[in-house]
């Protein structure tokens, strides 16, 4: 939860996860944009 809260700047890590998936640069750090697996 701290990753999403820190990256997305949201108190609610669930909301941060949803927002980060759509609004850069706040994106889920556990899924790098250069990840060859995705």
Curated annotation (Swiss-Prot):
Cofactors that this protein relies on: Ca(2+); heme b
Superkingdom of the source species: Eukaryota
One GO BP: hydrogen peroxide catabolic process
The EC number(s) this enzyme carries: 1.11.1.7
One MF annotation (Gene Ontology) recorded for this entry: metal ion binding
Protein's UniProt keywords contain Oxidoreductase: yes
Cofactor details (free text): Binds 1 Ca(2+) ion per heterodimer. Binds 1 heme b (iron(II)-protoporphyrin IX) group covalently per heterodimer.
Similarity comment: family membership: Belongs to the peroxidase family. XPO subfamily.
Subunit field text: Tetramer of two light chains and two heavy chains.
Protein name: Eosinophil peroxidase
Protein's gene: EPX
């Amino acid at each position: 939860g701290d990753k999403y809260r820190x990256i997305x700047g949201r108190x609610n890590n669930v909301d941060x996860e949803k927002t980060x998936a759509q609004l850069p640069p706040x994106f889920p750090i556990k899924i790098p944009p250069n990840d060859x697996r995705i």
